[in-house]
């Protein structure tokens, strides 16, 4: 059973009940706590746009605990983060792997954080294909382009040379929160709020 908790808030007009995610959204907090797919991307992008419309000056907080997922869905979130006027602060709580790590490092410079026991993992994109040789070749070219584009984003956002990124992403490259800070993926490790 996947129950979403509700909270009750006292107001001048009485009590008001919210699901926990709606209540957090009032505080400009968005949570990605699952694999990144089209449904998650649509929800996160809608929340980003809503919060921008509410106040284009205030930061938005994106909390990430995700094994990654679809690159197309991940890029939808990343592009929306870059599009909107408010800065997006990112925080890894648990795991930010694959595209989850890209979203973590895509936060505003100086505002990317991880909790002490977080784990961050970068790697090259995964893909599979079957079909005719031409279709396989087209897909292989697309995956190689994605690999280059992702490595460039990581290099640009971390300050690491692209050659190091290309080497490190050949396989799953896991980091602790402190190692991710040294690498340039996050700007700090948060012990207390």
Curated annotation (Swiss-Prot):
Enzyme active site: 98 (nucleophile), 123
Keyword Protein transport among UniProt keywords: no
Keyword Hydrolase: yes
Keywords, comma-separated and alphabetical: Cytoplasm, Hydrolase, Protease, Serine protease
HAMAP family, sorted: ClpP (MF_00444)
Task performed by this protein: Cleaves peptides in various proteins in a process that requires ATP hydrolysis. Has a chymotrypsin-like activity. Plays a major role in the degradation of misfolded proteins.
Protein name: ATP-dependent Clp protease proteolytic subunit 1
Organism: Bacillus cereus (strain ATCC 10987 / NRS 248)
Gene behind the chain: clpP1
